Amino acid sequence: MILFSSEIEFELRDKIKMNKLIIDGASEKIFLMIISNANIYNITHENTKINYEKLTIIINDFVLSKNIKITDINAIYINQGSGSFAGIRNSISVVKAFKVAKNIDYYCYNLDDFKDEKDLSHENIPNLCKKYKIKKNLINPAYLS
């Protein structure tokens, strides 16, 4: 049997599990979403000092509850503002730690980057980052004063 490159690519894409984690700590609630191929999971937590201090634990528990390990995450998308200074700062710190410890690439987006878009839902963020060529591993937060 001969397979053409597009068929091989399609077969490989089906076998490779793409797990994306979206973290939004800029709002009133800490929002987490996992996009795992065809499945989408999300959870929210109160945006409080206690939750900031245990953000890594919250993320790890959420990921494990979906039978995924942190090392299975291919990319992290993080809202870098505008919004809560503490939420953004803590989210960025956790994501940078994941980058250093597990070598997971991250993409810092700002909703202003996508101002001409109609669908700003969290599940669309990876596609918007790709469309607008958001650079990976670059942080430029926008805090509210």
Please provide the spans of the model-predicted regions:
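DPxDG-like acidic metal-binding loop motif
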Residues: 75-80, 85-106
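Phosphate/pyrophosphate-binding loops at sites that engage ATP/ADP/AMP, CoA/4′-phosphopantetheine
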Residues: 59-75
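Short, functional N-terminal and low-complexity linear motifs
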Residues: 23-29, 63-66, 83
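Stable alpha-helical structural segments in soluble proteins, enriched in small hydrophobic residues
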Residues: 62, 66, 93-95, 99-101, ...
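Oxyanion-binding and handling regions
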Residues: 1-57, 105-145
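Residue-level detector of alpha-helical recognition elements and their boundaries
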Residues: 70, 91, 109-113
